Regions:
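Signal-peptide-cleaved, periplasmic/extracellular N-terminal interaction regions immediately downstream
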Residues: 1-99, 103-111
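Extracytoplasmic
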Residues: 88-114, 120-156
Length: 156
């Protein structure tokens, strides 16, 4: 689950991260670098067979994240467009910003680095076609490529 908040210059991410990690449903929580000093973005990775709901309230304003068990699902192979793996920092944030309208997100790789990921496709052909569309953009980053992994795993 990717959370993006704007206008939160004094947001206490460390406290929130600690609170989220207290749940047995959580696999990982990590911050995404955002090129706006009044915004914050972070990812909450859920363990297998966990589902969620998010509710937003006002007066007072807050969000509620509910986590619960869901029916066991068989992991499947998924395809996606991605950048190379790198440290979480400004270069990664710049790639994510370029592809913001394609719902790009930063994901942690198996080796602890990070990658920008775009889309989720059921076949390599479908992902290749989407990558070809991106290649026609003027701002295309030529380091993107199609990759795959099991739906319950992080990419390589």
């Amino acid at each position: 689950i990717v959370f993006n908040f704007s206008g939160v210059r004094n947001f206490d991410y460390n406290k929130l991260q600690k609170d989220i990690f207290s749940s047995s449903y959580i696999k990982d929580v990590y911050r995404n670098i955002v090129l706006d000093d009044s915004a914050i973005s972070f990812v909450v990775e859920l363990k297998e067979n966990v589902d969620y709901s998010i509710s937003e309230y006002k007066e007072p304003g807050y969000m509620e994240l509910k986590l619960f068990n869901k029916n066991e699902e068989e992991p499947k192979n998924v395809y996606f467009i991605r950048s190379k793996a790198m440290e979480n920092g400004e270069p990664l944030a710049m790639i994510a910003e370029i592809y913001f309208n394609e719902d790009a997100t930063v994901v942690k790789t198996k080796n602890g680095l990070y990658s920008v990921s775009i889309g989720e496709y059921s076949s390599k052909e479908e992902a290749d076609k989407a990558l070809e569309t991106l290649k026609n953009r003027e701002d295309y980053n030529d380091e993107l490529y199609v990759d795959s992994c099991m739906s319950n795993e992080n990419p390589k």
